[in-house]
Amino acid sequence: YLDHGLGAPAPYVDPLEPKREVDELADQMGFQEAYRRFYGTT
């Protein structure tokens, strides 16, 4: 198992991990900006 620092072991790649990264960006700069940066859309 791999520990991704989330406090729990994950036996597989979390399919929601990219969304979590977007959520973290959204907390810092706002959702629309985070979405645009991550997906490359306006």
Swiss-Prot record:
The modification 4-carboxyglutamate is found at residues 17, 21. GO terms for biological process: biomineral tissue development; bone development; brain development; cellular response to insulin stimulus; cognition; glucose homeostasis; learning or memory; negative regulation of bone development. Residues 1-40 form the Gla domain. One of its GO terms (molecular function) is calcium ion binding. It is found in: Secreted. Gamma-carboxyglutamic acid residues are formed by vitamin K dependent carboxylation. These residues are essential for the binding of calcium. Keywords: Biomineralization, Calcium, Extinct organism protein, Gamma-carboxyglutamic acid, Hormone, Hydroxylation, Metal-binding, Secreted. The modification 4-hydroxyproline is found at residue 9. Ca(2+) 1 binds at residue 17. Ca(2+) 2 binds at residue 21. Belongs to the osteocalcin/matrix Gla protein family. Sequence data obtained by MS from fossilized bones of about 21 thousand years old. The carboxylated form is one of the main organic components of the bone matrix, which constitutes 1-2% of the total bone protein: it acts as a negative regulator of bone formation and is required to limit bone formation without impairing bone resorption or mineralization. The carboxylated form binds strongly to apatite and calcium. This is Osteocalcin. It comes from Camelops hesternus. The gene is BGLAP.
